[in-house]
Amino acid sequence: MGRMHSAGKGISSSAIPYSRNAPAWFKLSSESVIEQIVKYARKGLTPSQIGVLLRDAHGVTQARVITGNKIMRILKSNGLAPEIPEDLYYLIKKAVSVRKHLERNRKDKDAKFRLILIESRIHRLARYYRTVAVLPPNWKYESATASALVN
């Protein structure tokens, strides 16, 4: 996928396996994979961290193929889904760190420009999540309260 605020074309990407069935060598049941997902979520891991851990430690290629549901759906059904989507959360975290950097380095014009780009990405993503009802319709990003959202 191409980059939003740079000249990168984004040609390379990983290929998801076509097979929609669990591999023949995979021995865990879907219930045990769901238990692992819930256990890792209770420890405080994000959905992408859970996916990486399942892939590396347990050999789960795709949780959706084995369980029939995506990791986020499993977390929502167990009441463990994060209140802010993960990609939006990390954009807000990045904006908070850039703003903190700008407090110490007021003349850093490049950081000011990058902060504008980050915050426009946040506004665009928040608008999308409001339309698909992941976020409440009155949710708004404010730089003053952003550090409270991240911590």
From Swiss-Prot:
It comes from the Eukaryota. One of its GO terms (molecular function) is small ribosomal subunit rRNA binding. The keyword rRNA processing does not apply. Pfam families: Ribosomal_S13_N, Ribosomal_S15. GO terms for biological process: cytoplasmic translation; maturation of SSU-rRNA from tricistronic rRNA transcript (SSU-rRNA, 5.8S rRNA, LSU-rRNA). The keyword Transmembrane helix does not apply. It is found in: Cytoplasm. One of its GO terms (cellular component) is nucleolus. There is a cross-link at K39, K43 (Glycyl lysine isopeptide (Lys-Gly) (interchain with G-Cter in ubiquitin)). SMART domains: Ribosomal_S13_N, Ribosomal_S15. The modification Phosphoserine is found at S32. PROSITE patterns: RIBOSOMAL_S15. Keywords: Cytoplasm, Isopeptide bond, Phosphoprotein, Ribonucleoprotein, Ribosomal protein, Ubl conjugation. Gene3D superfamilies: 4.10.860.130, S15/NS1, RNA-binding. PANTHER family: RIBOSOMAL PROTEIN S15P/S13E, SMALL RIBOSOMAL SUBUNIT PROTEIN US15. Belongs to the universal ribosomal protein uS15 family. Component of the small ribosomal subunit (SSU). Mature yeast ribosomes consist of a small (40S) and a large (60S) subunit. The 40S small subunit contains 1 molecule of ribosomal RNA (18S rRNA) and 33 different proteins (encoded by 57 genes). The large 60S subunit contains 3 rRNA molecules (25S, 5.8S and 5S rRNA) and 46 different proteins (encoded by 81 genes). Component of the ribosome, a large ribonucleoprotein complex responsible for the synthesis of proteins in the cell. The small ribosomal subunit (SSU) binds messenger RNAs (mRNAs) and translates the encoded message by selecting cognate aminoacyl-transfer RNA (tRNA) molecules. The large subunit (LSU) contains the ribosomal catalytic site termed the peptidyl transferase center (PTC), which catalyzes the formation of peptide bonds, thereby polymerizing the amino acids delivered by tRNAs into a polypeptide chain. This is Small ribosomal subunit protein uS15. It comes from Saccharomyces cerevisiae (strain ATCC 204508 / S288c). The gene is RPS13.
